[in-house]
Design a protein with these regions (language model features):
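Active-site-lining helix/loop region of Rossmann-like oxidoreductase modules
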Residues: 7, 142-196
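Hydrophobic/small residue at the entry helix of a nucleotide-binding pocket
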Residues: 12-13
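Helix N-cap at the beta1-alpha1 junction of Rossmann-like dinucleotide-binding domains, i.e.
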Residues: 33-37
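Rossmann-fold cofactor-recognition segment
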Residues: 45-59
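Conserved Rossmann-fold cofactor-binding substructure of NAD(P)-dependent oxidoreductases
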Residues: 57-70
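Beta-loop-alpha module in the N-terminal Rossmann-like domain of NAD(P)-dependent dehydrogenases
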Residues: 62, 74-91, 105-106
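Rossmann-fold NAD(P)-binding glycine/threonine-rich loop
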Residues: 101-124
């Protein structure tokens, strides 16, 4: 049985916890700053193998104490990007595998530096984009002898938009604003370049 701590019981974290629990090979601890969402999720869906817990990464000593009392193999952070360096530090301290869904380049670089030489896997950017979209783009490129340009777009565009952005907010609003407000990078002529 694999033991995983999922931090953040929003839409994505709750979905991850459900999918892992339904596999039947995971013991999931679902942590959030209150018990309301994780507990309701477990009760409403009658999930077995999911333990709701109150964890707030703004108090890393408390999270560390929880990890000492409830050993897990991995942490998956579905928290806002700015929380992930703290979570990665906890994973390093406790010798755990680390995964996150961040899109933030600076945070990813911090985690890369933090995890240098770690004995366990540190895998930031495991979400849809970057993450899956990078894997899909790579696979598509392998089907061609030469590739000039690859443009992949990802979005949650609802049939009936209900907000000014005309976008479905299925993930962190903090992350969405951060992603659209910061410089992004691409590869041109084999070199990493900033894009406007």
């Amino acid at each position: 049985m694999h033991r995983v701590l999922v931090l953040g019981a929003g839409k994505i974290g709750s979905l991850v916890a459900c999918l892992l629990a339904q596999r039947g090979t995971y013991e999931v601890h679902l942590g959030d700053i209150t018990l309301t969402t994780p507990k309701r999720l477990v009760e409403d869906l009658r999930l077995e193998g999911v333990t709701p817990c109150i964890l707030d990464v703004r108090h890393p000593d408390a999270v560390s104490a929880y990890l000492s009392a409830h050993p897990v193999d991995a942490i998956l952070s579905s928290l806002p990007y700015f929380c992930n360096p703290t979570v990665a530090g906890l994973a390093l301290t406790h010798g755990l595998h680390y995964f996150d869904l961040t899109e933030d380049i600076e945070v990813t670089n911090q985690i890369k530096i933090l995890s240098a030489g770690a004995a366990h896997a540190f895998m930031p950017q495991c979400g849809l984009a970057p993450g899956f979209i990078s894997i899909a783009a790579h696979d598509l490129m392998t089907h061609f002898e030469t590739v000039d340009t690859v443009k992949m777009r990802v979005g949650a565009l609802p049939v009936h938009p209900s907000n000014a952005l005309k976008y479905s907010l299925t993930w962190s609003t903090d992350g969405l604003i951060n992603e659209y407000g910061n410089l992004c990078y691409g590869i041109e002529a084999g070199a990493k370049v900033p894009l406007q």
